[in-house]
Regions:
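Exposed, low-structure sequence patches enriched in small/polar residues
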Residues: 1-220
Length: 220
């Protein structure tokens, strides 16, 4: 299902400086400045149709140490549409980011190699605004823009993190012993999701053996 005016464009860059790579992305889902240009007497900042996101990060290595730091931000209602079938998703899954929209995210990854041992620590902190019952503050891309909680299709005054303020924390620590044809690994993961409505914490442990190249997975 398609309709005119529903487009998404993006740009990216990367700059290599010695052993470091600086990178970023900019995405525009919708940008409505005509109301301001026409001196609309009802115009205010935070118009919900100004939908965009961006990413800034750098990664590199120093001797046996590798590192990555990244910041991501997506404004409320981005990737959504007034017609739900036209949102940016596939098989009821968000294509761009698991959090949908309306979030700020900081990621840090540090790795260290010594002999046949690899160590990796990954941390993620996300600040988002979720919906309470019967509301739509722009995080859920599977709701219609016309149902925006602050004015529907004429929604002004929106800001990143509006709604039920929620902090998501994720920590992963991995140790890998590299043998001739397989890796023996152990992982411990901590997940915490906290807001005024909930406080959920989960801990996961994993031990296993994997061989390459079929199970070599990198998420960053």
């Amino acid at each position: 299902y398609s309709n005119k005016g529903n487009a998404l464009i993006g740009a990216n860059f990367n700059i290599k400086l010695f052993s470091n790579l600086f990178y970023g992305q900019l995405m525009l889902d919708d940008l409505n400045i005509s109301r301001q240009k026409d001196n609309d007497e009802n115009y205010q900042s935070g118009f919900f149709q100004n939908k965009y996101g961006f990413q800034l990060g750098f990664k590199g290595d120093l001797n046996n140490l590798s590192y990555l730091f990244e910041y991501n931000q997506v404004q409320p209602y981005t990737y959504g549409h007034r017609t739900i079938l036209q949102n940016y998703s596939h098989m009821n899954q968000a294509l761009a980011h698991p959090l949908g929209a309306n979030f700020k995210e900081v990621i840090g990854v540090i790795g260290y190699k010594r002999s046949n041992w690899n160590y990796r620590l990954k941390s993620l902190v996300a600040f988002t605004g979720l919906d309470s019952l019967g509301t739509h503050y722009g995080q859920d891309i599977f709701q219609s823009d016309n149902d925006a909680s602050t004015g529907g299709q004429y929604s002004y005054g929106n800001y990143n993190g509006q709604g039920v303020s929620t902090v998501i924390l994720s920590l992963d620590a991995e140790v890998v012993l590299k043998l001739e044809s397989v890796d023996v690994f152990g992982v411990i993961s901590l997940r915490n999701k906290k807001s005024d409505l909930l406080d959920q914490t989960s801990v996961y442990y994993s031990l296993g053996v994997r061989n390459f190249p079929f199970t070599n997975f990198f998420d960053y």
